[in-house]
C-alpha cells in the first residue's frame, strides 16, 4: 500500500482518505506497505514493508533496524539492483523500467512474491520481462529525435512528479489538464521550473491550472482546444532531444 494526496474530490480531506485505506488493511490477511507511511498507521498493521535507499554505499544502510519482513532496495548502475533484508541480500537486474517510483514497485513486488512463496527465479523472470503498464510513462514513438510518452494514467500530482523526475535531465513539453480533483498544485512548482519550459493545457481545469502557474518565470503556457491540438503545438516547438509528455497530473475525462 502507498499513500499520496489523491481523490480529494471524493473524500472530505486526507484524513478521510487515509481511513478508507485503513479499512482496506483491516480486511487484508497480509499487508505490503511502504515503510514511509507506517507513521500514519496503527502498529497492528505493520506486516511486510518496503522502501528504497539513495545512500551511496550499502554499508551505510541501517541493517540492524531491519527485520526479516523489511525490504530495502537500492538502484545500481546499468539497471541493476540490490535487495537487502535482515540476513538476506540479493543482486538482480531488470528491464528498462524508468523512474524512482518503479524502484519502489520492484521492491513491493518482491515482498508480495515472498508472501506467495514464489522462487527467486520466478521473480527475476517477471522483473526482466515486464516493460511497465500501458499509459504509465509509456513510450509512444520518436520523430526527428523527439520522443513522445503517454502518461495518461498519472492522474494526480505525485504521479506527475514521478514522471518529471524520470526526465529531469531533459527539456520537457508537458501536456496536462482535465479534472484536478481538488488536489493542491503547489508541489509541482519546483518541477515545472526545472525542466518544463512549455506547458500545454486542455480540459475542464485548464484555466485554473493556467492561473496558478502563470507567474512562473521561464514557463510558457499554451491553451489548447484538444489533445491533437496540444500535441501538434508541442511538436512544432520541440527540438531534437526534447520530450513530449502527454497527460499527467490530472484526470482527463474528455477522452
Q: Where are the regions a protein language model picked out?
A:
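Acidic, Mg2+-coordinating active-site environments of NTP-dependent enzymes
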Residues: 2-148, 210-213, 218-220
